[in-house]
């Protein structure tokens, strides 16, 4: 239910105007924001300049005649208190304090400064930070990263770490990860993780939430906010510092209480959030949640091009808590009519290398493979291992691109059927050798990845990442069924 608090945070993410205090013509917030849609409602504040990036620079925010909703305070920590005081006098709704040098230092001076900042802001202005990157919102133009796409999406991101927040921006294009709203909130002297969870839970533009957290001073409230949010939309959560050593680092990073790994795992499970293990898992799972339905069970089928991969995939799936059930006799019979028998393992995983390399003149039948597998009731997820670029280039030479597109488009027709008609989770792997100096291989790999992503399919660089993502998606389906009370096998 939307409240006045929702409206308050909505105004922060969607300000009518904004200012950068401590703006500079060099790299920084000013350079980023002048390239977004908020540029015409952006004010520069720095007494050392008369003009910054073609815009008038004011000595103080109090000198700006226009009303301002939001300001980025990009000055050294010792100047922050004065800047916030002027923002309060100006009547701003909220500020983001970028500077570090507060409680995260562990020094008495920084701790004292943070307490002074919290006391100053309380009841007078909403504050994000300090020690954080702030807000990225394509809809309003707020941003801290010039690499961001500014393309509106449905993924909400809450990160206590500024670097992890930026990673979501850096991988937006390559992972087809479209973001609605993102916040890096740092030391959280005022606005904290529960505030942003509750806001994104009610945000109509956000369908899935990625959360990175290191610690909190509001454990009970966080649990309540997580439960409320996860009850409305999926939340994938990564806790930094679940070991003793990691907890020590997490506490010193943002000054928050880290807690024990067991305590956090219990809270995530009871609230209905999906706990993941690393930043790759967080991004991979979030992308899958934003584009695909969770599987109805743990049965996985894989279409690959190698008997060796078939064996390894089966092991990996079982270790991840999944199952690799065999096809029914009826399905095997139907597959034999389509898949060349020679060199093929007619089982699950389906080692169908000849379909990738030698299928010619009847490629439309490739989609039927997915229709047959999708009809198997004990199969809930399908992984297409499309890591064949090197072999296709070697076999087809200059015609590899044309052959690849024909085969890929027919495979994708089957993938769409499995996802849209049969309700299966479909993931695709496209491997790109990071060290290759073969330009044709590189171009074809990027082409294939983009083609698959254009159809809304999550694409991963490794089989391990795809299988781990299926496992997390299955866990989410279990969480939805039992409200977070049960344990997930595996």
Report the location of each language-model feature.
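Catalytic-core regions of core metabolic enzymes
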Residues: 1-490
